[in-house]
């Protein structure tokens, strides 16, 4: 019975949070340590924000924001890594940091002020940044091991910097 009540109240709380979070001041945080990790959140309209911190082991995280002020931050330390950031409209801004092991980071931004930063240190790297319309700006830094970077920018301010160094 206790398990049922706990599960029911958890579902109710998540449902309520989803309704208010979809069109309010938004904000989301996921902090994880060790083992099989995976962090996911989706936000819809208004003030958005973000943050996903993952420490060690199999990692993987996905964050999706849709409209208004956006902002996102993802950090992954150690092991199999992989981070996806999708932002669609308005002030955008995304930062992804990865350290150690298989890495891979993808940032997709669509319209407005854009800005993307990806830093990868150690092991098999690979970074993709897609920006489409408005002020754009992209920086990718990769140090040590696999490297690879791809940046696609389409209309408006554009600017892309890729720095790669080995050891």
Residue ranges and their predicted role:
Residues 1-8:
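Positively charged n-region of N-terminal signal peptides that target proteins for export
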Residues 8-17:
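Bacterial N-terminal signal peptides
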Residues 18-24:
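Sec/Tat signal peptide C-region and signal peptidase I cleavage site
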Residues 24-167:
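Low-complexity repeat regions of mature extracellularly deployed or surface/particle-associated proteins
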């Amino acid at each position: 019975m206790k398990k049922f009540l706990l599960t029911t109240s958890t579902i109710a709380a998540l449902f309520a949070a989803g309704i208010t979070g979809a069109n309010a001041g938004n904000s989301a945080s996921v902090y994880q340590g060790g083992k099989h990790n995976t962090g996911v959140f989706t936000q819809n309209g208004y003030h958005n924000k973000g943050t996903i911190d993952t420490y060690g082991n199999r990692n993987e995280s996905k964050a999706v924001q849709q409209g208004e002020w956006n902002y996102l931050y993802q950090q992954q330390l150690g092991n199999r890594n992989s981070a996806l950031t999708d932002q669609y409209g308005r002030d955008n801004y995304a930062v992804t940091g990865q350290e150690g092991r298989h890495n891979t980071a993808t940032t997709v931004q669509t319209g407005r002020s854009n800005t993307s930063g990806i830093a990868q240190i150690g092991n098999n790297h690979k970074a993709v940044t897609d920006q489409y319309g408005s002020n754009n700006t992209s920086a990718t830094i990769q140090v040590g091991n696999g490297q690879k970077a791809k940046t696609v920018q389409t209309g408006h301010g554009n600017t892309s910097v890729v720095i790669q160094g080995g050891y």
